[in-house]
């Protein structure tokens, strides 16, 4: 097995998926950034959730807002619902794993807040319940999905935004999700604090 050849194949596959995403995603990423900035300007916050690698993405996004992205600026209110192991395990034990995010949203979410819901398949049951809880709390949802959008896509309201990666391969979807998250962070900073150029 030629490992370097395989590495080149993987890089090329990632580049091709990002090129396909470039053709379709910019309007949705822009709209998602506007939704998030509107919430932040109106004293709202952004909650985020996902499973596995998507949980890591939720935490990555939250940390970029709470700390900083590429410039010095004030901290922005963002909470990853994936980080409190005591809360997650108690909800999973006493109720079900499907409710680990929705119960937190019902407690923490307020009208005008935003939920960043991340699932490569769009079919994660606990993320679907999170979206339902966010709507109950009059929050706007930004969904990062892939494939056909799954069950998440059918739940979204007109004011929600879906950023659906045009791929069926989990790793490629995750790679574009991370790029989309970095785009959102950049656009949020530029809209709130101006361009650095």
Swiss-Prot record:
The keyword Isomerase applies. Residues 36-197 form the SIS domain. Pathway: Carbohydrate biosynthesis; D-glycero-D-manno-heptose 7-phosphate biosynthesis; D-glycero-alpha-D-manno-heptose 7-phosphate and D-glycero-beta-D-manno-heptose 7-phosphate from sedoheptulose 7-phosphate: step 1/1. PROSITE patterns: SIS. GO terms for biological process: carbohydrate metabolic process; D-glycero-D-manno-heptose 7-phosphate biosynthetic process. Binds 1 zinc ion per subunit. Keywords: Carbohydrate metabolism, Cytoplasm, Isomerase, Metal-binding, Zinc. GO terms for cellular component: cytoplasm. It comes from the Bacteria. It is found in: Cytoplasm. Belongs to the SIS family. GmhA subfamily. Catalyzes the isomerization of sedoheptulose 7-phosphate in D-glycero-D-manno-heptose 7-phosphate. The reaction produces a racemic mixture of D-glycero-alpha-D-manno-heptose 7-phosphate and D-glycero-beta-D-manno-heptose 7-phosphate. This is Phosphoheptose isomerase. It comes from Pseudomonas paraeruginosa (strain DSM 24068 / PA7) (Pseudomonas aeruginosa (strain PA7)). The lineage of its organism: Bacteria, Pseudomonadati, Pseudomonadota, Gammaproteobacteria, Pseudomonadales.
